Amino acid sequence: MSFIKEFKEFAVKGNVIDMAVGVVIGSAFGKIVSSLVGDVIMPVVGVLTGGVNFTDLKITIKEAVGENAAVTINYGNFIQVTIDFLIIAFCIFLAIKAINQLKKPEKQEPKAPAEPNDEVKLLSEIRDLLKK
């Protein structure tokens, strides 16, 4: 089988396509939640904390000198990204929980009893013969 044919079979499998759709939707969902956090939630948190903009929080290790920029640790941006992650994770958790509740449990048909092996069949025949 040629390399191209193998790749084509791999690419058109349902799981790969489902995963690709999930990645695209997840990316769009991430942008929505990032906007929710950055544009709606964090301004409210900033007002509640006295007008603090978390993305501006930083520790300056070395001041700017001439054309050289200052060396900083931008921990405020880390706080912002962490809050984004927590909200995204919580939203995904709620979505999965809702989907699982909407799914109807599949009715499981009772399994047919397993067919006895040869030894059991032979013993049953002997028993039946002894009853006669």
Curated annotation (Swiss-Prot):
Q: Which Pfam families match?
A: MscL
Q: Which UniProt keywords apply?
A: Cell inner membrane, Cell membrane, Ion channel, Ion transport, Membrane, Transmembrane, Transmembrane helix, Transport
Where does the record say this protein resides? Cell inner membrane
Task: Tell me which PROSITE patterns the record gives.
Answer: MSCL
What is the topology of this protein in the membrane according to its UniProt annotation? Answer: Multi-pass membrane protein
**GO CC entries:** plasma membrane
Purpose of the protein: Channel that opens in response to stretch forces in the membrane lipid bilayer. May participate in the regulation of osmotic pressure changes within the cell.
Task: Determine if Transferase is one of this entry's keywords.
Answer: no
HAMAP family registered for this protein in UniProt: MscL
Family, per entry: Belongs to the MscL family.
What subunit structure does UniProt give?
A: Homopentamer.
Q: Which organism is it from?
A: Campylobacter hominis (strain ATCC BAA-381 / DSM 21671 / CCUG 45161 / LMG 19568 / NCTC 13146 / CH001A)
Instruction: Give this protein's Gene Ontology molecular function annotations.
Output: mechanosensitive monoatomic ion channel activity
Domain of life of the organism encoding this protein: Bacteria
Query: Which named protein is this?
Result: Large-conductance mechanosensitive channel
Transmembrane segment boundaries: 10-30, 76-96
